[in-house]
C-alpha cells in the first residue's frame, strides 16, 4: 500500500504494523510510510510528465500539420509547455487574459486554415467552426475529456470529413490510459509507417504488433 492509497491511509497502515503501546515505533513507522508514499507519487508525476512532453510527439504533430496545409487544425496538450513547443500556429491557454483569449479565438474562427494549440481550456465550451483535424498529444484515462475533445472536431458541417490523431507512446502506461478513455469509441491503431500512409492518402497497413501491458515502465 506504499503509493497514493498508502499516503491517504497512512495512519491506518501504521496501526496495522505497529503495537498500539509503542509511541516511538508508531511515529517512526508513520514517517517511513509518508516518505515512501511521497517518493512513489513523485515518481508517478515524473513518469506522466515524461510521457506528456515526449519529443516524438512534437515531431509527429509537426509532420501532420505540415502534411495538412489546407486544414483547420486544433492540437490538445496536457500542459502549456507542450502546446507552446509545437511552434506552428497560435497558442490558446489559461495563461492568456480573457481579452487576449477572446481575440485569439475570434481571429482563428475567421480563418479558413490554420493551427490553434491548446490544453485544458478548449476541452469544452468553445465554439470553433471549420475544424477538420485534431491532434491529441496529451491524454489520460478520462473518457469524458476524450469525448469533449473529439466533439471540438466532429461537428456536422456540410460534407466535412474530420481526422483525429491520438499520439500514444507504445509500451508505456499511456496505452492503458488511451484504452480506458476510448472504451466506447471506434478507432484504428497504426504505427509511424501507417501514419505516413494516411498522410499521403493511402490505406495504412494494420498495426498487428501486440501492445504489451508494460504498466511498470515509463
Question: Model-derived features: where do they sit?
Answer:
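Interdomain helical connector at the RecA1-RecA2 junction of SF1/SF2 helicase-like NTPases
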Residues: 1-68
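Long, largely alpha-helical accessory region at the distal end of helicase-like NTP-driven motors
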Residues: 190-218
Amino acid at each position: 500500500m506504499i503509493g497514493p492509497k498508502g499516503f491517504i491511509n497512512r495512519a491506518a497502515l501504521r496501526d496495522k504494523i505497529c503495537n498500539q503501546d509503542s509511541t516511538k515505533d508508531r511515529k517512526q513507522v508513520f514517517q517511513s510510510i509518508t516518505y515512501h508514499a511521497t517518493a512513489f507519487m513523485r515518481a508517478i508525476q515524473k513518469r506522466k510528465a515524461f510521457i506528456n512532453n515526449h519529443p516524438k510527439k512534437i515531431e509527429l504533430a509537426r509532420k501532420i500539420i505540415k502534411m495538412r496545409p489546407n486544414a483547420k487544425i486544433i492540437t490538445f496538450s496536457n500542459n502549456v509547455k507542450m502546446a507552446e513547443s509545437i511552434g506552428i500556429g497560435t497558442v490558446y491557454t489559461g495563461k492568456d487574459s480573457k481579452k487576449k483569449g477572446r481575440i485569439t479565438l475570434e481571429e482563428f474562427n475567421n480563418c479558413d486554415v490554420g493551427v490553434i494549440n491548446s490544453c485544458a481550456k478548449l476541452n469544452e465550451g468553445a465554439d470553433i467552426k471549420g475544424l477538420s483535424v485534431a491532434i491529441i498529444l496529451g491524454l489520460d484515462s478520462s473518457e469524458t475529456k476524450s469525448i469533449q475533445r473529439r466533439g471540438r472536431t466532429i461537428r456536422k458541417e456540410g460534407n466535412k470529413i474530420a481526422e483525429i490523431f491520438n499520439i500514444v507512446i507504445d509500451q508505456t502506461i499511456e496505452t492503458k490510459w488511451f484504452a480506458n478513455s476510448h472504451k466506447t469509441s471506434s478507432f484504428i491503431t497504426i504505427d509511424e509507417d501507417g501514419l505516413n500512409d494516411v498522410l499521403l492518402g493511402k490505406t495504412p497497413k494494420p498495426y498487428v504488433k501486440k501492445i504489451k501491458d508494460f504498466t511498470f515502465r515509463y
